[in-house]
């Protein structure tokens, strides 16, 4: 059985969404981000990214990780590419060319988009969005996102999905990366194709199931 290490309020959310899309049975092992704890190495601390038991799984001390049989993997976007290929179906590439495009868009999301969207979401997580520094961080990140969003806006003209004529792992990975910036409504209003596309992605039953579980997850775990 697939084991997912992480919590829903983290990058693990995209792996949980993928598992829901594929209809996989999985075990979830809650691993909290160490930054959320006053003393992550205290004897009473819950399992977290600095716990020795988790470091044995992922020496980089980051979530998510998975265990699938004898395979241990890290890096959420790579995990999703693996799960798509492992289980096949419409979320995976149907040709070598499609496989290449799914990988291309996933790497693009990681390199061109996520570095900026993470700045936005962490500003909110740290409750700095109303401070001068926080507002400047968000403004700079939004400016940096204009070019990649313009590229995506053009790519989505006349099409529903990123690759081919169906929802794939590329849509899931990119939608999750962009979700971190959805607090900035003007950014998406300026790119209507992107806005409509991410709404299609987030209307899927598997996404809603993931978000429902995320909403029930105790903050303190």
Where are these regions (language model features)?
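GST-like domain detector, emphasizing the conserved glutathione-binding G-site
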Residues: 1-136
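Basic/polar N-terminal segments that are highly enriched at the extreme N-terminus
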Residues: 1-3, 154, 218-221
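Residue-level signal for nonpolar/aromatic packing positions in well-ordered secondary structure
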Residues: 19, 66, 79, 102, ...
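GST-like fold's C-terminal all-alpha helical module
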Residues: 93, 97, 105-203
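Terminal-tail/helix-coil boundary detector
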Residues: 207-221
């Amino acid at each position: 059985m697939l084991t997912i290490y992480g919590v829903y309020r983290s990058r693990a959310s995209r792996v949980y969404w993928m598992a829901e899309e594929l209809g996989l049975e999985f075990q979830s092992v809650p691993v909290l981000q160490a930054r959320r704890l006053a003393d992550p190495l205290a004897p009473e601390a819950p399992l977290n990214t600095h716990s020795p038991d988790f470091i044995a799984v992922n020496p980089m001390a980051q979530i998510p990780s998975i265990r699938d049989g004898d395979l241990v993997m890290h890096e959420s976007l790579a995990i999703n590419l693996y799960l798509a290929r492992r289980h096949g179906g419409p979320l995976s590439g149907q040709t070598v060319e499609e496989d290449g495009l799914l990988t291309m868009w996933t790497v693009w999301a990681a390199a061109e988009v996520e570095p900026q969207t993470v700045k936005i979401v962490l500003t909110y997580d740290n409750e700095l969005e109303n401070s001068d520094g926080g507002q400047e961080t968000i403004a700079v990140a939004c400016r940096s996102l204009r070019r990649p969003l313009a590229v995506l806006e053009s790519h989505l003209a006349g099409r529903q999905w990123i690759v081919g004529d169906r929802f794939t792992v590329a849509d899931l990975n990119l939608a999750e990366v962009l979700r971190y910036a959805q607090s900035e409504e003007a950014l998406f209003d300026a790119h209507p194709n992107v806005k409509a596309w991410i709404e299609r992605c987030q209307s899927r039953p598997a996404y809603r199931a993931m978000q429902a579980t995320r909403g029930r997850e105790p903050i303190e775990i």
